[in-house]
Amino acid sequence: MSEKKNLFRLALSKLAEVKTYWKTPPSGKYVPFKEIAAYSVGGAGVYFIYSLVGQITLNAGSMIVGASIGIDAIDLQTMNALSILLGFLIAPARAMMFDNTRSKMGKFRPYILYMGLPTAIFSTAFVYMPYETMDYSKKCITVFIFYTLLQFFSPFYQAAYAGLVQVLSPNSAERGWIIEISSIIYSFAPTVINPVLPLIGDLENIQTYRIAFPIFCLLGIFVSMFCVFGTQERIIVPKSYVQKVGFIEGLKKVSKNKYFWIVNSSNWLGFLAGGAGYIFQWIFYYGMNNSSLYALMVVIKGEASTPGMALAAPLMNKFGKKKICLFSLSAQVFCLIMMLTCYKNYILVFVFIFLKDMVGALSIIYLPAMNADMMDYQQYKTGDRLEGFIGQTGPLLTSAISLVTGYAIPLILKNFGLTNNYSDLYDGDFRNPIVKAMIVYSIIGTLLSLIPYLFYDLDETKRGSMIKALKVRALFEDRLRNEISEEALVDTMKDIIEAEEILKNETEHKKADIDAAKIILAEVSKFTDSSSGSRINLELLKEEYFAKVNAEA
């Protein structure tokens, strides 16, 4: 009974906390709960649309394009390669538009507002094309045209939502918490869509998608408006800062970001891991041949992500992003190895698929958190907020590499006799060798994708010191223009004085704290050393700081 009372009291205290900080953030934080709710609920709208667009893929796992419309797996990859080549023209423009956008709404929210509707319209129009009356070549042309249109609008839409969280707060821990909350809420969209589709009709039947797409797209447009009009972008820059970055200049600056290369090289090395995405559908949709039971299993499988997402932020805060990342990938390898021993046993293989998805869901939190830290490092390194260039250059390079690596899985499937004859997957003798091969290649791909993260060294102490260095930069540049605020003065000078105290007594502090203090004071020296012309009088700023603190006391 006492345990229930304690839980009840805890729930009441949390509700009281939400009420208290609904419009005003807690001390030391930047984002009120109202804004977190708007970002999270709006994200469900974005993902209603994005999850449907995700059904339209040019690979062997696409039930719409492969099984329903009937395009050969090799032809799908060839169309994908052509789309990638066109993307080389689109992605740079998208990057420049993101990073040079200057509007009252910020740099990301305008694209959520304006790119959602065309994404919804073209995806719905795609499934309503009369494929039943088309010959094979016309099907290929139609699919390619619509896919190319979607690849212009959809990445704007999804990247804008993903990028928005990176500028909601400069506090990494707070960002991680927002990502966790929003991920749990917006995952409601695919959690609903994936089991509903097989209940509407067969996944090989285009009529199923003609019912689902307009309903969920319309719902998505309306719900996504919450994050457009209910959030605010916050970045630490001087008041006079106006960013304008050219394409070549942006690429040069991004190339100096080592964490950009670490995160993206993991994607490049892990191309074989994509085979794991086919396993569940092939084993349970084709193997069990029961749409209702398959829909139930999709619901259960979808819930595997929830504990992973819920645990990710506290685990990251305790162990750091790198350790959680390595644990997630290693645990997935273990689950794949176990699946290799039991893929013919529906119960056991489902257990390991569930566990793999659960530990894999940690990446839903730690990858955006790593990406946000990567943006902060970029600003610290070059002085620019390059979310657009980083967000588009990575996928662009990945696409270029996939012009070659993308043929690996289709060629493997072709070697096993699978092209567009998806109905043969109902036969266990045909299906099981392919499933086994996909598991083996997924193990190899996941192991390769783990290697780059061994070199990731941007821990919380180092990242926090970079944020403080950015505050120093903003404070001093504002000081030179007589635009300094008292709040910024107190906050930043406190960090500088603490850093000085650490270096005066190095023997009493950890190496990480000493290195962090050096990063902060190195930024100070850029504005105060004789080599810089002594532009800033640090002692005078200290006098102003202590006068302000004493006055408040």
Where are these regions (language model features)?
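Acidic, Ser/Thr-rich low-complexity segments on the non-lumenal side of membrane proteins
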Residues: 484-515
